[in-house]
Curated annotation (Swiss-Prot):
Database matches in SMART domains: DUF167
Disulfide bonds: none
PANTHER family per UniProt: UPF0235 PROTEIN C15ORF40
NCBIfam families: DUF167 family protein, PRK05090.1
GO cellular component: cytoplasm
Family per record: Belongs to the UPF0235 family.
Gene3D superfamilies documented for this protein: YggU-like
Superkingdom: Bacteria
Name of the molecule in the record: UPF0235 protein KPN78578_33230
Amino acid sequence: MSAVETCADGLVLRLYIQPKASRDSIVGVHGDELKVAITAPPVDGQANAHLVKFLAKQFRVAKSQVLIEKGELGRHKQVKIIAPQQIPTAVAALTE
């Protein structure tokens, strides 16, 4: 399975999350996952909430259209983006 896959209603991303980073960014490929650095600490769901907000902004969708399907409590996550309006260049390179 690759880091980014298209599905009927959007994209499925396999992510490796780096919490407490200096800035929010999509870093690149990390093994068979997409590495995302976020500034929030991994405490009380803050990192998950921040990740959803960051991805919603990157793909220009509502936060309700970003679903964490797997990995709620770990660094390895599977996230579904429903009907993305924009695809960031780091992700677009992997979908081709």
